[in-house]
Amino acid sequence: ITLNDVQSILTNYGVPGKVFNINLYKRAFIHRSYTKRPALENTKENIIIEDCPDDCLQLKQKSNERLEFLGDGVLECITKYYLYRRFPKENEGFMTEKKIALVKNESIGKLAYEMGLHKWYIISKHAEEKKIRTNLKKLGCLFESFLGALFLDFNKISIEDEDKWFKDVFVTGPGFQIAQIFVEKIFEQHIDWTALIKNDDNYKNILQVKVQKQFKITPDYLEISHDPDEGYRMGVYICLGQTIHGLEH
């Protein structure tokens, strides 16, 4: 991704097109499949590293996962505050449901795709074959990484005042406020709020409420299997009053 690309994304969503550290944004687009692996790990798995072709990027040292971790927290806080202001008469249960609907990976992955972020995703050939570039869960991670980069980049700004109050009180700069403007503009441009309010597709929550109401118990959830790229693959089993052994899915 280029400086002009980043500036265009920022200005499209109400943020000044000023980039202080382009490398943060470049890092945000590096999937872990395109990073260098430890030599010992390659030897153990009999992986032979070929020379990089002239028309390919060199493998990167670090992926976007630390930025994703940061962006996830920033997005969570911004979304909660946005819902708190948008729905002043709703209770915390309603806001929690809508927050889950907004920030789940598939939802923000859809936003990332509509924004065109997938075009700059740096992934391996194997990941490309597994259609990671259009995998909404992975694009959700990409969105969070970009947001983490934006947050850090605008924290580079120092705010001075005569009494040095900003310097003594705030650990960060205005990165959160800039991220807030960015996310809220995206919500306003891409989210169908009428559909979001009417629909409740949190099927796990619907089932749990019914089970708790009728049987006075809370279900236990068991992870069936997990693929690092594809995510969770879960069979659905309901067990009331007895243990299930030897599950297949």
Q: Language model features by range: what are they?
A:
Residues I1-H249:
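Double-stranded RNA-binding/processing signature
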